[in-house]
Swiss-Prot record:
Cellular compartments annotated: Cytoplasm
Protein name as catalogued: 3-isopropylmalate dehydrogenase
InterPro entries linked: IsoCit/isopropylmalate_DH_CS (IPR019818), IsoPropMal-DH-like_dom (IPR024084), Isopropylmalate_DH (IPR004429)
Catalytic activity, reaction form: (2R,3S)-3-isopropylmalate + NAD(+) = 4-methyl-2-oxopentanoate + CO2 + NADH
Entry's Gene Ontology molecular function annotations: 3-isopropylmalate dehydrogenase activity; magnesium ion binding; NAD binding
Cofactor(s) the protein needs: Mg(2+); Mn(2+)
PANTHER family: 3-ISOPROPYLMALATE DEHYDROGENASE
Database matches in SUPFAM superfamilies: Isocitrate/Isopropylmalate dehydrogenase-like
UniProt pathway annotation: Amino-acid biosynthesis; L-leucine biosynthesis; L-leucine from 3-methyl-2-oxobutanoate: step 3/4
Origin species: Brucella melitensis biotype 1 (strain ATCC 23456 / CCUG 17765 / NCTC 10094 / 16M)
Residues the UniProt record annotates as site (Important for catalysis): Y142, K193
């Protein structure tokens, strides 16, 4: 049996508490399902700065590059607000993305039936929502040059950011979108602003050409990004996989997440290029929520996003689709049973802490795996 190597980077704040619940699930996957996961641990963020003077050490970066996948908790907190910019905790995540060459960011927006009432939208609009936003992560306006503020010499200044995409960047993210759609409902909606942006014109052309060349079996539609934002709120269930660039993906993924009414419960994945020999992609999985330093150490953090990140890892890095399905079903089942951490609790439900929520999900997962 091939080994499955995981690097766990709990990080700061509630990261270690949430990761502790993931370790329980991994232990079960090994002891009862004999899946052979090998885990290593490392430091990232503020705790890495405290130990090494940098947001992630070279040694832990090497571990990340050698692993089949990385599970990442959260970084940052007031303790490190005054550290130098170049070693700030968030830099650890940025270095992981850069050195692992993770260019595809997957942000699911899933509405658990038991939490449909938490959305600001009508239940009939949101119930059963399951869409995936695929954001290009390493190009576009966040990385384009020049990027500067210049003094015009007349009392005025000019801020410059550059939106730039090359054909290969568009083609490779399009490939990921079409591949993902085949495992879902076989539809991709590509969003850009081709009406006012040349990069949008090229994006549209590149996605269209790639579709015709390699993915004609998948349904493709194009939509202007502003119209896409409107449609996300009007009728989100029309979408399956939304493909878009770095800037629009940043905006649209947060809009889609809040449709579910549970931003802090959603996972994400960042994938790199497929290895030419093994076909495997470098990958990092993390909850969407932050480090929540205000509740760290209190035992009340919600571990669902971290556990759901493990489910994404099982699905996309290891092809363990049945196990991923069961773990996601376990999360939904526990919510159906009325078990809630404080952040999602309401009258009539049972309030539990981090450990109790993790134990409940594991028990449900074990029952589904029997």
């Amino acid at each position: 049996m091939a080994s499955r190597k995981l690097l766990l980077l709990p990080g700061d704040g509630i990261g270690p508490e949430a990761m502790a619940e993931v370790r329980k699930v991994i232990a079960f996957l090994n002891s009862d399902l004999n899946l052979g996961f090998e885990t290593e641990e490392g430091l990232v963020g503020g705790c890495a700065y405290d130990a090494h003077g940098q947001a992630i050490s070279d040694a832990d970066m090497e571990k990340a590059l050698a692993a089949d996948a990385v599970l990442f908790g959260a970084v940052g907190g007031p303790k490190w607000d005054s550290v130098p910019y170049e070693v700030r905790p968030e830099g650890g995540l940025l270095r992981l993305r850069k050195d692992m060459q993770l260019y595809a960011n997957l942000r699911p927006a899933i509405c658990y039936p038991a939490l449909a009432h938490s959305s600001s939208l009508k239940p009939e609009v949101i119930e059963g929502l399951d869409i995936l936003i695929l954001r290009e992560l390493t190009g576009g306006v966040y990385f384009g040059e020049p990027k500067e503020i210049i003094d015009l010499g007349n009392g005025q200044k000019r801020g410059i950011d550059t939106q730039v995409y090359d054909t290969y960047e568009i083609e490779r993210i399009a490939d990921v979108a079409f591949e993902l759609a085949r495992t879902r409902r076989n539809k991709v909606t590509s969003m850009e602003k081709r009406n006012v942006m040349k990069s949008g014109v090229l994006w549209n052309q590149g996605v269209t050409a790639r579709h015709k060349e390699k993915h004609a079996d998948v349904q493709l539609e194009h939509m202007l990004a502003d119209a896409g934002g409107m449609q996300l709120v009007r009728w989100p269930k029309q979408f399956d996989v939304i493909l878009t660039d770095n800037l629009f993906g940043d905006l649209l993924s947060d809009v889609a997440a809040m449709l579910t009414g549970s931003l802090g419960m959603l996972p994400s994945a960042s994938l790199g290029a497929a290895d030419s020999k093994t076909g495997k992609r470098k990958a990092l999985y993390e909850p969407v929520h932050g480090s929540a330093p205000d509740i760290a150490g209190k035992g009340i953090a919600n571990p669902i996003a971290m556990i759901a990140s493990l489910a994404m890892c099982l699905r996309y890095s290891f092809g363990l689709v049945a196990e991923a399905d069961r773990l996601e079903a376990a999360i939904a089942g526990v919510l159906d049973d009325g078990i809630r951490t404080a952040d999602i609790w309401s009258e009539g439900n049972t309030k539990v802490g981090t450990t109790e929520m993790g134990d409940a999900i594991l028990a449900k997962f074990k029952a589904l795996s029997a």
